[in-house]
Curated annotation (Swiss-Prot):
Name of the protein this chain belongs to: Iron-regulated surface determinant protein C
Gene encoding the protein: isdC
Compositionally biased spans, kind Polar residues: 173-182
Binding residues for heme: S47, I48, Y132, Y136
Segments of this protein annotated with the region Disordered: 149-191
GO biological process terms on file: heme transport
Induction: Repressed by fur in the presence of iron.
Amino acid sequence: MKNILKVFNTTILALIIIIATFSNSANAADSGTLNYEVYKYNTNDTSIANDYFNKPAKYIKKNGKLYVQITVNHSHWITGMSIEGHKENIISKNTAKDERTSEFEVSKLNGKVDGKIDVYIDEKVNGKPFKYDHHYNITYKFNGPTDVAGANAPGKDDKNSASGSDKGSDGATTGQSESNSSNKDKVENPQTNAGTPAYIYAIPVASLALLIAITLFVRKKSKGNVE
């Protein structure tokens, strides 16, 4: 009887370790950090606005969708942002550092995605009065993993509402006027949803079945010993 109980306890402990290990592996695969750059719209040229975006960003997959969490400095200058038509969801603010972290739904974590930015400045910059109010397109270049897929589709935020694009000059920092952009945001097709591997869900089921079988076996043995 003692030997049976030892086997039973060892098996239970092993199952707990296995389930915890695979659960942690699944969670680790669905979140992490990614480096990125902010480009002038539809180019490979780094935007001066890139300096106002802290690196790296964080990504997370939840409910089959991909999200990135981006932190900006000079937060009070940047009055609005969107990526692939999805408006920002502000999740935290740091008034002392003038920073905020916003979450965006995205279609992928690696490659270019289009975004929009609203900038309003009415204060002294480098000791001189400066006023600037503009809305323009930018391009994010994500350098994240390619094996984390989501079922995201681009949002339907008014794609033609931007009054200009950050292509050739950086209005947010130079104050130069920019020509109106008639180009629609070009959004690449989202990746198909690979989903979480099936074995992640099968492991707890198999473990439960094994636990039930062992329990019945132990009870049967115990009953036999009593009789």
